Amino acid sequence: MATAPSVWTPPEWNAPEETREELVPLEWRGLRYTCRLVTSDRPPVTEPLLLLGGALQDMYAWPRLERRLSAHMPLVFVDLPGVGTADDLPAEQGFDALAEAALVVTDRLGFDRINLLGASYGAPIAYRAALSRPARVARLVLAGATHRMNPRLVSDCEQVWSARAALADDIDGTLSDSGTHEIAGRAVATLLNTARRDQVSQAATVARLLHRQFARITPAAARRHAVCHRRLLASDPLPAERIDAVRALVFTGEHDDVSTPDENRAVAAAIAESTFLLVRDADHMVHLEREAEYADLILRFLTDLPLDDLPYTTAPERPGARR
């Protein structure tokens, strides 16, 4: 039976009258990449936010969150090596290398301290960045995080994108309509909890959106996605070391079967000053299924507002506190 949507009225979102975008070229160990710095005409209410997204997200992949947060703080989006416009990251390089490349962004922009958001594939990068330079991270947000990915799931993802890279009807790499829809459908099924779709907000809409996105992916991009998923299989995404000096929020959708609630809770338990909660009526794609709530939750945490009694989340837990 479908769950009733959580009753919640989003606050008024007053977009800034003017935003400015700057593309900043970066280089790390000979690899070229770029970040986007988005600022507004309003004074910031918290430290700049650096966003590290999933394997399928480039620096233009967060338009909804960008619109909702740009009035409150500078936003930094980045194509790390292996993503978007950046150079390819050698397959043997892991998440430690990506964390180093992410921290170059803060050095290049001259930020003493930042807020850091790591979502899905970006979570192990953000965790490592906070672990290595905790004094630079004011607050850490991890969405859809796990110490160890389900190897069957990751293998399925890798096979989907390897198949897209290999299957082409002609020299330009295009697929027939049937081939395109088959690959896109398989990709969507790896990210959404189809068994609970009647309990997930906007499940059908999000499935269609992702299907259209995946159907347009080129063989070159598919090869990159396959490499990203091989990286997840090569080693555990998160290190065993605890984070003791950074305040953190760890969350995901209550129906997430990519990084399960228990897996996210275990990540929160490895961070001394962590808060853990779940967003209701959502799965791994919570940023699309409940985008207003996603933005509200992040803004609340980054501006030190209470997270208690929110109608769209479970009660906050503090699993990282040492007994």
Language model feature labels by segment:
Residues M1-V24:
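An N-terminal hydrophobic leader/cap segment in hydrolases
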Residues L31, R36, V76-Y121, D296:
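Active-site loop/oxyanion-hole signature of alpha/beta-hydrolase fold enzymes
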Residues L31-D87, P306:
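Conserved HGGG/HGGXW glycine-rich cap/lid loop of the alpha/beta-hydrolase fold
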Residues I125-A129:
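Hydrolases whose catalytic domains are alpha/beta-hydrolase-1, hotdog thioesterase
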Residues L131, A138-T174:
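Flexible "cap/lid" loop of the alpha/beta hydrolase fold
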Residues P151, T174-R242:
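Conserved alpha/beta-hydrolase catalytic His-Asp/Glu region
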Residues P219-A266, L278:
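Conserved serine/cysteine hydrolase catalytic core
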Residues S274-R323:
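Catalytic active-site module of serine/aspartate enzymes centered on a nucleophile-bearing elbow/loop
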